């Protein structure tokens, strides 16, 4: 559904409270005697705040389970489609990991795609990763003029004027446009969601304690449909492609949030951000 469909509705409807339907939920309505629809109840089936944190402190077991859950998240998405697959690859940890796992699981050639300005470090590192995993790689260079010219189309696609979201969406929108034009790929894997699940943003280093670290991860995940998922899903789907985001797999997220606060908190463990996934993958060297 798109908000653009509300543009031509009557003014009397605007006087009513219009809210966004929450993801992972079901609402029940019924006709009342006055011949209008009455809201009965909402049921939420999945929310990050409902996932319990357990005392999972045995690190070796945790690392093995992290890898297993992520591998299964990728595998189910690869196996459940017969359409041509491609991966977005920035050269960073998250997209590189997903691309490597897809390459392991996928039977056949895998095309990876990256985008950046001329001389971009992202393009260089994406090519290094592609060479390592053996994918057929496509680097798309974009100019500042093309970047700026696409902004109105991006805003129309994602239905948001949020400055950060729009800026972050341009690359996804542009590379999806190129994938549509230059290939037959229909299902696009990406590394989105990892920073929210694992506290990967730089400001997480400033968390006062591990409880605050956990609380902010859950808040970001609760609101992710307003920002990163909106950016990723709509930028890609606006070109007739289907996004696949394994880091937001329900079972993976539920398990990761069950790990004790302190073990997940890289600041507390004097480690790099997302250190658990780094160590989990290092053991398997995809």
Model feature map: region roles:
Residues 1-160, 186, 282:
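Cysteine-centered catalytic environments shared across enzyme families
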Residues 59-66, 98, 122, 167-172, ...:
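Hydrophobic (often cysteine-bearing) scaffold residues that line and stabilize catalytic clefts
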Residues 69, 220-221:
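Basic, alpha-helical interaction scaffolds
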Residues 112, 150, 172, 197-201:
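Adenylate-forming
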Residues 162-166:
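Acceptor-substrate binding/catalytic loop of class I
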Residues 178-181:
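Short, well-structured alpha-helical segments in soluble
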Residues 185-215, 222-286:
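Mid-to-C-terminal catalytic subdomains of enzymes
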């Amino acid at each position: 559904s798109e908000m653009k469909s509300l543009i031509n509705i009557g003014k009397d409807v605007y006087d009513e409270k219009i809210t966004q339907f929450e993801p992972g939920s079901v609402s029940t309505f019924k006709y009342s005697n006055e011949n209008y629809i009455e809201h009965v109840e909402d049921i939420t089936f999945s929310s990050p705040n409902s996932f319990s944190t357990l005392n999972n402190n045995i690190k070796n077991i945790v690392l093995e389970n992290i890898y297993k859950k992520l591998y299964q998240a990728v595998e189910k998405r690869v196996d459940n489609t017969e359409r041509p697959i491609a991966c977005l690859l920035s050269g960073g940890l998250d997209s590189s990991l997903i691309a490597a796992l897809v390459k392991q699981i996928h039977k056949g050639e895998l095309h990876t795609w990256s985008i950046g300005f001329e001389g971009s470090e992202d393009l260089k590192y994406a090519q290094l990763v592609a060479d390592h995993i053996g994918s057929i790689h496509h680097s798309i260079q974009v100019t500042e003029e093309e970047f700026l010219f696409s902004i109105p189309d991006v805003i129309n696609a994602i239905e948001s004027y949020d400055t950060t979201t729009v800026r972050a969406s341009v690359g996804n929108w542009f590379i999806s446009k190129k994938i549509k034009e230059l290939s037959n790929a229909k299902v696009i894997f990406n590394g989105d969601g990892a920073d929210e699940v694992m506290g990967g943003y730089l400001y997480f280093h400033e968390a006062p304690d591990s409880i605050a670290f956990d609380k902010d991860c859950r808040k970001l995940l609760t609101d992710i449909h307003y920002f990163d998922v909106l950016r990723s899903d709509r930028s890609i789907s606006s070109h007739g492609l289907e996004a696949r985001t394994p880091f937001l797999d329900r079972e993976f997220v539920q398990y990761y949030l069950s790990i004790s606060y302190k073990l997940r908190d890289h600041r507390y463990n004097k480690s790099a951000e997302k250190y658990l996934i780094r160590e989990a993958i290092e053991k398997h060297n995809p």
